[in-house]
Amino acid sequence: MLMTKPPVPQLNLTAVHEAAERAARAIPPLWPLESSVAVNPFLGQIGEPLAVAAARLRRVAGAAVTMPRAWYAERIASGELSDVDLAAAIDAATPTTRPLTIAELKRAAQMEIAPPQALPTVADLASAVSGFDWTGFVAERISAWASGYFDRGQALWAAPKGPNAYAAWRLTATHDLTPEIFSITGFAADVAAAPESADAALIRAVEQLGLSEAASESYFHRLLVGLGGWAQLARYRLWQAELSGSTDTTVTDLLAVRAVWDSALLRKYQPQIAAEWTDAINGYAQPLQPTEDDQINAILQDAVERAAQRKLQTVLTASSQPKPEDRPALQMAFCIDVRSEPFRRALESLDPRIRTLGFGGFFGLPIAHRRFASDVVEARLPVLLPPRVTTSCSGHTHAHEANDRAKRVAARAKRAWGRFKLAAISSFAFVESMGPVYVAKLLSDGLRPGTRTTNTDPVPQFDPPLALGARVDTAEAVLRAMSLTGPFAPLVLIAGHGASVVNNPHASALHCGACGGFPGDVNARLLAGLLNDPEVRTALAGRDIAIPADTLFVGALHDTTTDAVTLYDADHHSPAHAAALAQTRDWLATAGALTRSERALRLPRAATGGAIARRARDWAEVRPEWALAGCRAFIAAPRSHTSGRDLQGQAFLHDYDWRKDTDFSVLELILTAPVVVASWISLQYYGSTVAPETFGAGNKLLHNVTGGIGVVEGNGGLLRSGLPWQSVHDGERLVHQPLRLSVLIEAPHEAISTILDRYPEVRALFDNGWMHLLALDDNGRMHWRYGGDGGWERADNPPANQRVASFE
């Protein structure tokens, strides 16, 4: 039977291609496991407010963007969410859609609403009329091909690549008889007859499906969301290409592949689903319009976040012991990561002469690094930036060269052994014969107290070396950005951070996000070396940064899983600092013990801090640490505003003194780099909590690595992105409360506005409510609140129209 389709006007090919490009950019990127970093799952929706994003993601993903109503009702009933918070959220909402009274909002919170439903694809409709899961079948066939195409060396037989993803899929699909076996007659022949380019194939599929131009973008977005992590991995390729000034077509190639499948299924089931498919096309073509429930959910979410800000204000205004003004005995710079906050608080409590500060964990060094005995280049910087400097740990001595050769031989042997274990002809025999050998290692790792294997690479160095002028400029820029221009302690530690876990495919996600998913030790050691350089210090003195001759900078690594700190003092041998280093090691050990005891209260089955190290080496432990769960605030201000306050490991802390930032260049850096990185982290946790099926990685217990790039649940299926459920839930309750990030900055709000005007993509995050922005006064109190569209309102003295009485 010939397939008939609804009549549509002549397609505007340019419009269809533009719709495909917009749909591709609505998908967030997914970094491979080796350098996994947190990504904002709403990256493609930052140009629209939460309620509009809710309407869009309901249409294309069937996903919620807020919690169930009962979650808000519980907080109202407990008093955590007060009438003041509800009133303020109502007042901030769009006047034409907000409920009139607090009472109405409370009643709405008591009413559960239907879960969101996505518009159907042809595969969905075919599944409904046939009783066969065509949606799952299509996902399985695409995943089977994609896991080979994107493979990074895990597969023993390489899949055909072709010049691009679409061409590679055609090579496979024209020989794959699985669709024929499952009754899609002529599928392979149809693929063979399809156009050779993805663009032409997509146009052909659009014509066969009878899509209108108005429906194309939403339909394309729907198909890409249905591909899960595969579409996001393709989006990563586009992201990386654009960082280097080129482009990549893998996302639209996958879109064409998925559209061909729908076209084939429509040919088979058109008589049964014609009317439903026409309705679906009309639904895709409708303008986005948030419902009343979308608006109410957005108001309730805003109210919960205002309640959290009110609680944070109470903590920040609590009194604390002032620090003495004399020269500190120890200064220690940490990454702004929320996991450093409890350690910093514990360390400072040991001696009033200890100062800590926070800065982005790549420490201002945008490096592409090659480790010792390796040719792999690691981008150890925020994924928002391209590397600008190359570094290595190659070393030049005879001993280093011999060690390099030995490590390379060992690495090759390890790879060969791994391939032997996985080979089709040897894998079963391997398990039978060699399995008992691994019992000793399992017992050793499970029972022996955990000790982290530290990085023993030679001292990292700029390769090629930087000229003196570049070294001085870099050192000055970093010190001023850290607000570290004096006085300097005799010992200054630059501490990156990493994690020590075993049997965890997402291990890189526990490392430093500002270092691209790698530990921060290399950046810390490089900066320490730069600041110990006598020529650099001499030049810095001429720029009003005088570093005393007795000040030693030492790189360090904070293990966030065990709270042990490794010092790389051997990089800069200094007998004069032996006593200071010994005292510092004692302080660090004590601070680590205090921090572990605090963290043990939150970790399941970790009654004491002593259990932390054991958990780090437990192959069966799914929660070795909580990582950044609980993150809710970013504070850029002098440390005096947060020192001594218990922020419960929930705040990113960036030292910043606007009085030293005469041209506000440091403020610009903060708003455009660490704030954006923190938003990605915060919103990944948010998305993985409110919609774990769509934005989360599923059950960690079922994860299998595929292609060396990502995880699937079980033995196949779609690539999963986001956080595993165990990263936000302890088995009984949520440990991460889904709150959009509150950004608190001590700086004139006019200066903040000026910078936002120069960066529309950053401003969009605040204009559309994906983050809150508050300006602090000189005492650390929330003084101004950003209201969107460049406007500010007083945060400490609500206007009359925010009074609770006006809504009752």
From Swiss-Prot:
It is a peripheral membrane protein. It comes from the Bacteria. One of its GO terms (molecular function) is zinc ion binding. The keyword Acyltransferase does not apply. Coiled coil: none annotated. Part of an energy-coupled inorganic carbon pump. The gene is dabA. Keywords: Cell inner membrane, Cell membrane, Membrane, Metal-binding, Transport, Zinc. It comes from Rhodopseudomonas palustris (strain TIE-1). GO terms for cellular component: plasma membrane. Its cofactor is Zn(2+). It is found in: Cell inner membrane. The lineage of its organism: Bacteria, Pseudomonadati, Pseudomonadota, Alphaproteobacteria, Hyphomicrobiales. Forms a complex with DabB. This is Probable inorganic carbon transporter subunit DabA. Its main location: membrane. HAMAP family: DabA (MF_01871). InterPro entries: DabA. Belongs to the inorganic carbon transporter (TC 9.A.2) DabA family. Zn(2+) binds at residues 335, 337, 497, 512.
